[in-house]
Every structure is written in C-alpha cells, then in structure tokens.
Amino acid sequence: MIFGHGIDLQEISAVKKAYDRNPRFAKKVLTPKEWERFESLSGERQMSFLAGRWAGKEAFSKAWGTGIGAVGFKDIEILNNDKGAPVVTQSPFEGNVFISISHSGDFVQASVILEKTKR
C-alpha cells in the first residue's frame, strides 16, 4: 500500500551559489558515504550530484509527510546500485522506498514513493 509520494525540483545553479557561499553546506546535506562520492566528482558534476541528493531527500521528506526538519538530511542516504540507479539505503521509513532522480539542463527533479509492506 502506498504510504506517500513526494516530488522536489532543485535548480543546480542555486545549489552552487549556496555551496560557493559556504562549502560546509554539502557536509550538512550528505552522509559520509555520499560525501565520498561527491569528493570523487569534479566541477559541474559535483553540483549536479549535490542538487540531486538534496532533491531526493526533500522528496523523501514530503512523502514521509513532514518536510525537512522532522527528518534530517543525514537521516536519509541515497547511494547508487551496481547499475548506477539511485537507491535509498538509509531512512526512518520501514517499508519499500522507490526513488527516481532526473537531470535536465539546470534542473534536478526527484520523486519518492514510500510503500508500506504487509505484516
């Protein structure tokens, strides 16, 4: 049964401005494993990755029904599987989490569906 669905859209240039003002911003959003991946990238790819993780976590918090605050950025971890697709590997939700992150030009869109599992 679907518990919630959240969508978020981020402008990569706005995320870059926030990062340029305060590079520690990325460490507030990313878990240690996400940070490792971020550090392995460079330039525009770094900002695209950061914006994608931000959008994914915002979308999760909307699906969860709270928004960021009741659930923190570091409570949610989004890594890539062996095919490169994003997967939520850590979250407060007990059930299935489906995530999609899409990049187009200066924008990143994320969609998260939370599905309760039957017990």
From Swiss-Prot:
It catalyses: apo-[ACP] + CoA = holo-[ACP] + adenosine 3',5'-bisphosphate + H(+). Its EC number is 2.7.8.7. GO terms for molecular function: holo-[acyl-carrier-protein] synthase activity; magnesium ion binding. InterPro entries: 4-PPantetheinyl_Trfase_dom, 4-PPantetheinyl_Trfase_dom_sf, ACPS, Ppantetheine-prot_Trfase_dom. Signal peptide: none annotated. Mg(2+) binds at residues 8, 58. It comes from the Bacteria. Pfam families: ACPS (PF01648). Gene3D superfamilies: 4'-phosphopantetheinyl transferase domain. Belongs to the P-Pant transferase superfamily. AcpS family. It is an enzyme of class 2 (transferase). Its cofactor is Mg(2+). GO terms for cellular component: cytoplasm. Keywords: Cytoplasm, Fatty acid biosynthesis, Fatty acid metabolism, Lipid biosynthesis, Lipid metabolism, Magnesium, Metal-binding, Transferase. SUPFAM superfamilies: 4'-phosphopantetheinyl transferase (SSF56214). It is found in: Cytoplasm. GO terms for biological process: fatty acid biosynthetic process. It comes from Streptococcus thermophilus (strain ATCC BAA-250 / LMG 18311). This is Holo-[acyl-carrier-protein] synthase. Transfers the 4'-phosphopantetheine moiety from coenzyme A to a Ser of acyl-carrier-protein.
